[in-house]
Amino acid sequence: TLHVPLTEENRHMIGAEEIASMKDHAVLINTSRGGLVDDKALAEAVASGKLLGAGLDVVEEEPLPAGHPLLTNPNIVVTPHIGGGTADIGDVIMPMLAEDIKTMAAGNLPIHTVNKEYLNK
């Protein structure tokens, strides 16, 4: 599984070469960001049997066009970026978000800021 932000440095961090080095019949899961995985290379790897399948909550091109290989392969599951929509969102994430909004309204950086280095640019 992938758990990283998308940057220009890691775009297509999983491409044909990386997939070729994976164990045969592995399953790739991406819930992070579209663009981390080369969707064309992934579709080809699943179609060829190199990978058993994939679970994608994000893809490079959203929305995918009808008939796209990621949508037509039965061994690939694509969800509309709702993989994080679990039952605890109301109990954990919403209060965290509310606290960050109050912090920002007071003129401070949110506690959970992940890109602080870019805020002063």
Which role does the model predict for each range below?
Residues 1-69:
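Rossmann-like adenosine-cofactor binding region
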Residues 60-121:
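C-terminal helix-to-coil terminal segments
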